[in-house]
UniProtKB/Swiss-Prot annotation:
PANTHER family: FERROCHELATASE, FERROCHELATASE, MITOCHONDRIAL. Its main location: cytoplasm. The lineage of its organism: Bacteria, Bacillati, Bacillota, Bacilli, Bacillales. This is Coproporphyrin III ferrochelatase 1. The keyword Metal-binding applies. Its EC number is 4.99.1.9. It comes from Bacillus cereus (strain ZK / E33L).
Length: 311
């Protein structure tokens, strides 16, 4: 009989329906309810992208496809997938409890975010391991980052190339690629967090692979707090690159995210497009990885490598 291994897939989570927005936002704010204005602002953003984010559906599809693929590519162990979310049910702790109840003793934990940071990956894996320690007899092996995974980089190289191949030579010369991820509070840099460096590296790999000479790194979706967040913000960067270099086509690759969701569909497709429209430039954004075969293959390699290194 094959050994059963837990596959703990973790993600941020998103409201399932409009009525969930307040409790979701309250959880993000560590139990403090948002003001009516803040709640209205977030609700309006969801309405602007069609009422609710497709993220919940995509995350589940990614996790299920990954489990299926892992069980197809090898025959030594049987992977059982558990989904754990940071800010809405099924919570990370609930997924760990379920694993424990199912008699799983070893699990690989994968966060659906390619870059490591103390704010994201470390906190997800930390929550899972803490719960596993409480329950006993369950070891969770966390994956720190997978931004260098060749098939992940290749996904974005192909996606970016696809956009540039549709341009004329003249347009290509005046085009710039903006590679971005979710901003985090600036204080993480002083703490030696590798997050910004990993995004810069990702941008270099993608630009090199796609043979794009003009590119820049930007940050997006910063939180509404008094602390300074990492910049430049993608909207400011767009204006600056247009003013400084006269770029007239902007290609946005939000590589810190893995799916179409609010931060991409609103912060990129709406807010960045407002800026490109304002300056008379063209807006492009490649399709997100979502549950594409190429992306699932890259995650499969990540999990298999981790399993081989720890078991």
């Amino acid at each position: 009989m094959k050994k059963k291994i837990g596959l703990l897939v973790m993600a941020y989570g998103t409201p399932y329906k409009e009525e969930d927005i307040e409790r979701y936002y309250t959880h993000i704010r560590r139990g403090r309810k948002p003001s009516p204005e803040m709640l209205e602002d977030l609700t309006e953003r969801y309405r602007a992208i069609g009422g609710i984010s497709p993220l919940a559906t995509i995350t589940l599809e990614q996790a299920k496809k990954l489990e299926k693929r892992l069980n197809e590519v090898q025959d030594e162990v049987e992977y059982h997938m558990y989904l754990g979310l940071k800010h809405i049910e099924p919570f990370i702790e609930d997924a760990v409890k379920e694993m424990h109840n199912d008699g799983i003793q070893d699990a690989i934990a994968l966060v659906l975010a390619p870059h490591y940071s103390t704010f994201s990956v470390k906190s997800y894996v930390g929550r899972a391991q803490e719960e596993a320690e409480k329950l006993g007899n369950l070891t969770i092996h966390g994956i720190d980052s997978w931004y260098k995974e060749p098939k992940f980089i290749q996904y974005w190289v192909d996606a970016v190339k696809g956009i540039y191949n549709g341009m004329s030579d003249a347009e290509r010369e005046k085009a710039v690629l903006i590679v971005s991820a979710h901003s985090l509070p600036e204080k993480i840099i002083a703490m030696g967090d590798p997050y910004p460096d990993q995004l810069n590296e990702t941008a270099d790999y993608i630009a090199r692979g796609a043979e794009v000479a003009n590119y820049a790194v930007g940050w997006q979706s910063a939180g509404n707090t008094p602390d300074p967040w990492i910049g430049p913000d993608v909207q400011d960067l767009t204006r600056e690159l247009n003013e400084k270099y006269g770029y007239t086509s902007f290609v946005y690759a939000p590589v810190g995210f893995v799916a179409e969701h609010l931060e991409v569909l609103y912060d990129n497709d709406f807010e960045c497009k407002v800026v490109t429209d304002e300056i008379g430039a063209k807006y492009y954004r490649p399709e997100m990885p979502n549950a594409s075969d190429a992306f699932i293959d890259s995650l499969t390699d990540v999990v298999v490598k981790k399993k081989e290194s720890v078991m």
